[in-house]
């Protein structure tokens, strides 16, 4: 097995420019593909998840021209030209869910599948929502999970569409992005959310990006959304992808644990991503954080004792960045509790189980619940722990921070970071000092 040994490091400082946001990159690619006109996308993330989206769009007949982190997309005016396609989408939820919805109303024969883990990640709530408007979608293996077979269908909207919001916000995102393509009797479609909507900031990203492409979604709280029906997305001409706020969390934590000063460029006060809220959680734990419109600085910890304060917080809004808090909790002077993180169980791996297992390897006492994690740090971190990463990019990046505790750590299968941040470990090593 491939592995990477890190540390021991005693400090971290410098400046890092973030790669483009995964969530924004894949949304913008699909919107540009469906729009009227040509869109130039800059700072597009180059990673496994964006590559599978680009490959799929190419197979669907979308004209794409890539040059470094810039991509010029020629829109299809709302309908893909390829009416049959077999689409492999890896483990990219940001590609599988929105593309499934767009294909369901495109009048073609499609197969959507991915890696084995993708076939364990639920999609039934989205399929149920699409079937309400007449979509013909069949499960190839297990009910409620990919692979999917999508067939031509007569699509019509007669009543509000209901979708569950408590498993993944990507189901709602997929519906919102697709519904403008569908005609409705009174020129609008209503989507109603059953249960509490999780990861609300990701829906905010979707609505803001749709607006950039000329389609305005009205919402009543987070339970009812009104989407214009039978309209065309219009290219904004140029659009820049902001830095990935989830990826920022590792460097911000490094600036706290390693003393800093460490500056992250590409996200800040003006960001449309909810995961910039990670900086506020870090401040609650005692880190010295300052923020500009598109940068965040961290300069160590503001306590004389030099340790973070423990935290007890609801992380429903920022589940991805919350993983970094779980590892930062190793450096606190007491027990931390991460609440409302049930969505971790259906991500790239069961992140609650994986995080509990690996935190114990470095000496933590961990209590694992259905939707919470309680982390009590050890007196001293266990050196030379071999961290398993479960083919989950965020597990690998989170546990790199252990090396800032003055102990070496081994990361197994480090290449899994290719999903969102292929050169993460090079960037981390450039900032960490022995």
Curated annotation (Swiss-Prot):
Organism: Burkholderia orbicola (strain MC0-3)
Single GO MF annotation: 3-phosphoshikimate 1-carboxyvinyltransferase activity
Binding site for 3-phosphoshikimate: 22-23, 27, 168-170, 199, 320, 347
Binding site for phosphoenolpyruvate: 22, 93, 121, 170, 351, 394, 419
Record protein name field: 3-phosphoshikimate 1-carboxyvinyltransferase
Pfam families cross-referenced by the UniProt entry: EPSP_synthase
Location (main, coarse): cytoplasm
InterPro entries the record matches: Enolpyruvate_Tfrase_dom, Enolpyruvate_Tfrase_sf, EPSP_synthase, EPSP_synthase_CS, RNA3'P_cycl/enolpyr_Trfase_a/b
Gene (UniProt): aroA
Keyword terms of this UniProt record: Amino-acid biosynthesis, Aromatic amino acid biosynthesis, Cytoplasm, Transferase
């Amino acid at each position: 097995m491939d592995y990477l040994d890190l540390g021991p490091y005693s400090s971290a400082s410098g400046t890092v420019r973030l790669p483009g946001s995964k969530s924004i990159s894949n949304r913008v690619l699909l919107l540009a593909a469906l729009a009227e006109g040509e869109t130039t996308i800059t700072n597009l993330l180059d990673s496994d998840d964006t590559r599978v989206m680009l490959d799929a769009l190419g197979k669907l007949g979308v004209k794409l021209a890539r040059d470094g982190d810039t991509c010029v997309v020629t829109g299809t005016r709302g309908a893909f030209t390829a009416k049959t396609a077999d689409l492999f989408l890896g483990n990219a939820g940001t590609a599988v869910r929105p593309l499934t919805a767009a294909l369901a109303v495109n009048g073609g024969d499609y197969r959507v599948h991915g890696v084995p883990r993708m076939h364990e990640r639920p999609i039934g709530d989205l399929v149920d929502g699409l079937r309400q408007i007449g979509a013909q979608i069949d499960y190839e293996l297990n009910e409620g999970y990919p692979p999917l077979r999508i067939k031509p269908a007569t699509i019509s909207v007669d009543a509000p569409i209901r979708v569950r919001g408590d498993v993944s916000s990507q189901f709602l995102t997929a519906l919102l992005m697709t519904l403008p393509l569908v005609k409705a009797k009174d020129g609008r479609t209503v989507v109603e959310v059953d249960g509490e909507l999780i990861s609300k900031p990701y829906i905010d990203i979707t609505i803001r990006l749709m607006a950039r492409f000329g389609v305005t979604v009205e919402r009543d709280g987070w339970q009812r959304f009104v989407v214009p029906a039978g309209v065309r997305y219009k290219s904004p001409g140029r659009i820049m992808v902001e830095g990935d706020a989830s990826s920022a969390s590792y460097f911000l934590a490094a600036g706290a644990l390693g003393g800093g000063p460490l500056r992250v460029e590409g996200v800040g006060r003006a960001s449309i991503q909810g995961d910039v809220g990670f900086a506020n959680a870090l401040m609650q734990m005692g880190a010295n954080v300052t923020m500009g419109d598109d940068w965040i600085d961290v300069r160590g910890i503001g306590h004389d004792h030099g340790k973070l304060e423990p935290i007890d917080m609801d992380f429903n809004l920022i589940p991805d960045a919350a993983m970094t808090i779980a590892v930062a909790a190793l450096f606190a002077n007491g027990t931390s509790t991460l609440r409302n993180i049930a969505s971790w169980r259906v991500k790239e791996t069961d992140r609650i189980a994986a995080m509990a297992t690996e935190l114990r390897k470095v000496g933590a006492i961990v209590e694992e619940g259905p939707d919470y994690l309680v982390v009590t740090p050890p007196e001293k971190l266990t050196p030379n722990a071999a961290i398993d990463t479960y083919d989950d990019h965020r597990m690998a990046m989170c546990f790199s921070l252990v090396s800032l505790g003055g102990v070496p750590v081994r990361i197994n299968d480090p290449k899994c970071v290719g999903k969102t941040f292929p050169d993460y470990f090079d960037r981390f090593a450039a900032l960490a000092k022995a």
